[in-house]
């Protein structure tokens, strides 16, 4: 049986010690598990509290706890790299999603200007 897992499960596996760690490890033996990019986004947000070395952590966790398909996996991996390069977690996931889908991003955020994603300015024009 395949079950969807959320961030508590990922945190239990990622932390050195967690009250759910044993249960999470047992669940890996008992079930096929799957999660989404949202859980990995939440893990990146929790990173500051737990001080994870998140780039290798996420790559390793994706092997244990995959997302639905290869496209979503690419979003997560690219987002973690963008975050590592200084983007906010949310902008990193937006940029990774746009890049993976081969889309431009309509935004006022200048952070997109230095990456693989083409930014279509949302900024007001002189006429407005």
Q: Could you say what each language-model-derived stretch is?
A:
Residues 1-35, 47-57:
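Short, well-structured N-terminal submotif of metal-dependent ribonuclease cores
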Residues 41-44, 80:
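Amphipathic alpha-helical segments within well-ordered protein domains
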Residues 10, 40, 112-113:
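A generic structural signal for short hydrophobic patches within well-formed alpha-helices
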Residues 62-84:
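Acidic catalytic patch
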Residues 5-6, 34-37, 87-88, 109, ...:
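Histidine- and aromatic-rich ligand-binding microenvironments
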Residues 88-104:
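Acidic, metal-associated active-site segment
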Residues 2, 68-69, 99-128:
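Acidic, PIN/NYN-like endoribonuclease modules and their adjacent C-terminal/linker elements
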Residues 38, 70-74, 93:
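Short beta->alpha linker loops
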């Amino acid at each position: 049986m395949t079950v969807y897992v959320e961030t508590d499960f990922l945190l239990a596996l990622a932390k050195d010690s967690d009250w759910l760690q044993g249960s999470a490890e047992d669940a890996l033996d008992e079930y096929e598990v799957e999660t989404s990019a949202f859980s990995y986004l939440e893990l990146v947000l929790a990173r500051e509290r737990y001080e994870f070395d998140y780039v290798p952590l996420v790559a390793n966790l994706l092997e244990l706890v995959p997302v639905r398909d290869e496209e979503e996996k690419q979003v997560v991996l690219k987002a973690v790299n963008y975050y590592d390069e200084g983007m906010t977690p949310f902008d990193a996931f937006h940029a990774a999603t746009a890049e993976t889908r081969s889309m431009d991003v309509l935004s006022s955020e200048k952070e997109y200007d230095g990456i693989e994603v083409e930014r279509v300015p949302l900024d007001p024009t002189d006429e407005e």
